[in-house]
Design a protein with these regions (language model features):
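Metallo-beta-lactamase
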Residues: 2-4, 8-84
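Accessory terminal helices/loops
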Residues: 52-137
C-alpha cells in the first residue's frame, strides 16, 4: 500500500499469515518527514498528506497485530513497535496540521553540536519543516 510520509514513494505491506504490518520508515517513534526539495520534484510530502496516509494505516488495524519498522528506536532488536506508536504518530501529525502541536528543540544526533525542532506527542517525535505542513493548492 502507498504510504507517503518519510518519503513520497513510501510503501507498507501486511503479511496476512503472520498479521505483521511492515511499515519500513513510514512510522516510528522518531519520524522524519521528507520535506527537502521543490514540491514539483516529487521529493516532498506535506504533514497533511502524511497524516492521511497514517489514517489509512490506523484504519487497517483489524488486519495486523504487530508493526515492524526499519529504524531502531531503543527497543529490543527485532521487537515490534509499541502498540500505541501508530496512533500517537497520527495524533502528532493532526496537531501539527491544526497548529496545536507541542514543539521542542532536541539534540540532533546527525550533526555535531546542533539541535532540531520536533513536534512531540506522547513518545513520538516528528521532524518536519514549517513550510511543509499543508498541501499546496
Amino acid at each position: 500500500y502507498s504510504c507517503p510520509g518519510h518519503t513520497p514513494g513510501e510503501m507498507i505491506f501486511i503479511d496476512s499469515k503472520t498479521r505483521y504490518l511492515f511499515c519500513a520508515d513510514a512510522c516510528n517513534r522518531n519520524l522524519l518527514l521528507m520535506q527537502s526539495g521543490d514540491h514539483t520534484e516529487g521529493r516532498y510530502v506535506s504533514v497533511e498528506k502524511a497524516a492521511k496516509a497514517m489514517e489509512r494505516i490506523v484504519s487497517m488495524k483489524d488486519q495486523y497485530d504487530h508493526v515492524i519498522n526499519s529504524h531502531h528506536d531503543y527497543r529490543g532488536f527485532g521487537a515490534p513497535l509499541a502498540d500505541y506508536v501508530v496512533d500517537q504518530a497520527l495524533e502528532c501529525m493532526k496537531k501539527i496540521v491544526d497548529g496545536t502541536a507541542e514543539i521542542r528543540e532536541i539534540p540532533d544526533p546527525l550533526q555535531l553540536n546542533a539541535t532540531k525542532t520536533v513536534a512531540v506527542y506522547g513518545d513520538v517525535f516528528i521532524t518536519y519543516s514549517k513550510e511543509g505542513v499543508y498541501e499546496t493548492r
